[in-house]
Structure formats: structure tokens, C-alpha cells
Amino acid sequence: QLASMVNALREEILRTPRDEAALAREVQAMREKMRKHLLPDERTEAGEFNLKQGAGGIVDIEFMVQYAVLAWSHRVPELARWSDNVRILETLGREGLFEQQECAALTQAYLTYRSAAHQLSLQQQPVIAPAGSYLEERVAVSAKWQQLFAPYTTDTTNE
């Protein structure tokens, strides 16, 4: 009974209407802050791709999915039903919020990255790949990120 109460509260919170533009700016700012903190410049400059934190990586997919849940669950309650990214991506495609092809590409990238990250972790290696790795996935993820958030990007040079 406690689990069902917690789940009901979770869904209620997720389905609260939000200002999409403000949410998008907050998500972008949080992602940039994480990237600066968790992705050392020397790694990027060394020609490596961090599967989790790199541009077009796991965390970018997770942030887009969570943005979609927070932004649109009040209109599409089904988005708040699941907590896993793959089922949420399926819902986004089914409901027409993302193109089906985009959802397939994001899901494939997410599962590919996670599998590689698990293999590296089992070998006690960092979740780093050569810079030329996963180019198709990185392009697809980065393109969707731009499409989703570019309309809400603000020019901070005048602030």
C-alpha cells in the first residue's frame, strides 16, 4: 500500500504543469554545470568520448527524457507512468511528441552506450571510448538535443 501511495504522489508531482521555456533553460543550465564539473577538459582534448558525460552521451539522453516527462506529463499522463528511459522513449514516439525514428535512434544509442559502459565497468575501466567511437549515435543524440532545446537557448552575452 505504501508503494502505491508513493507512486501516486510521484505521478502527481510529475504531472504538475510547468513553464516549458523556463524548464528547458533550467535543464540546459544544469547539464552544462554537470558537464563542466564531471568532464575534465584534458579528457576531451585527448580525443576521448565519455559515454556518460560526453556531448551526445547517456546523460544527454536522460536529461531529454526527463525534460519531456516534466514538460508534457500534464498533457500526456502516460509519460509519468514509467521511470525507465526506454519505455518513456516508446511513449514519446507513440504519442507523437518525438518522431518514431528519433525515439528508435535515442533508444539504440542509450542501450548501446549502457552496454559498453557496463562492459568497461566490469573490466574496472573508465567509461571512456576513443573519440571516433559511436559517431552515428552521438550525432543523433546531439541533433535531438539541439532540436529540443535550441528554441529556449538564451543569449547570455548581454547579461
Q: What residues fall within each predicted segment?
A:
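A nucleotide- and high-energy phosphate-metabolite-utilizing enzyme signature
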Residues: 1-159
